[in-house]
Amino acid sequence: EIPLRLVGSEMCIRDRVKNVKIGPSPAWMRERIRNAGMRPINNVVDITNYVMLEYGQPMHAFDFSCVNNGEIHVRLAREGESVQTLDGTDRRLSSSMLCICDTDKPVGVAGVMGGANSEIEGDTAMVLFESANFNGTSIRRTANALGMRTDASSRYEKGLDVENTYKAVERACELVELLGCGEVVEGIIDVVPRAISTVSLKLEPEKINALLGTDISRDTMEDILVRLGFTMEGDIIHVPSWRGDVEHYSDIAEEVARFYGYNEIPTCFAGGNTTSGGFTPLQQCERQIGQTCRSLGMDEIITYSFISPGYYDKIRMPADSPLRDSLRILNPPVSYT
């Protein structure tokens, strides 16, 4: 049994871990990874990348011998901490960045890239698999601040299915055993620092039909939703974990409309009464003055707007820019001088 401890934070929803030994990477997996536009590294890293391509769930593998005291902490970085990532670059972390650490140091930037100090190498004998679900906003801000957008961060920032973490790590361990490249150690450590919220909505056919302008029956709506993976419990619709975009009854209406068929929704002209436009007393006065002046032989012209030279400074235009050589008037308004 391996003494492993995870310390969760508000930004980390779930971590699932299993440990394997390293073996050679099969040729077919390397070829499939290349076809997906990625570079094969070694057997363990290839498995994590392969699972990410299959499930859309990023994973990471640590050299367990490099994890001090066998403990993994998921926490915010301390001001001034730094870590060398797998690309060989030293990254200076701020207190708003989530990181993966052991008892002494960061071993990776959570959701972005692992650290070189726990990299899988040829002499690695024990591996720690991590499958996590991090807050997408936090990961996006960290990736932007560090100037590194990775395959993992681009997936996290869009939001992932919380329930997929377990499936991904199980698939990774299945590949380890299936390919005979290691021995899976029993035990999964699952940390859920806060309850996973689920979305439930009330099915209101009248409201949906009023929004869509249709007359779809309740049974048809329920059939569409069930086929899309929603579960029904009376009037309550339970939204599946992978549908993070469904939060309001209008989202349910959209799902119903898409699968009922937009072509089945009747078209009609826009309703309502039209009224003739009018002018305000000031507009009527201006039009009357203009008409009188034109009848007296005057010409009406529309010129370019006058602006103060100070606007160039507001938009930070260089002092030697040729665009500053505009036409100057001899009697500018007082506010422009």
Task: Give the ranges of each region predicted by the language model.
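Conserved mixed alpha/beta core segments that line enzyme active sites in large multi-domain catalysts
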Residues: 26, 30-35, 42, 48-117
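Single conserved hydrophobic/aromatic residue that forms the stacking wall/gate
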Residues: 1-8, 13
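Flexible, glycine/charged-enriched surface loops at secondary-structure junctions
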Residues: 40-47, 176-191, 233-234, 267, ...
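Hydrophobic alpha-helical scaffolding
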Residues: 16-23, 38, 86-89, 103, ...
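Short, glycine-/Ser/Thr-/acidic-enriched flexible segments
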Residues: 22, 49, 57-59, 79-81, ...
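Mobile "lid/hinge" segments at catalytic clefts and subdomain interfaces of large enzymes
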Residues: 100-196
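Extended, well-folded interaction surfaces typified by the phenylalanyl-tRNA synthetase beta subunit core
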Residues: 201-336
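Generic, well-ordered alpha-helical scaffold segments in large soluble proteins
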Residues: 16-20, 32-39, 47-54, 58, ...
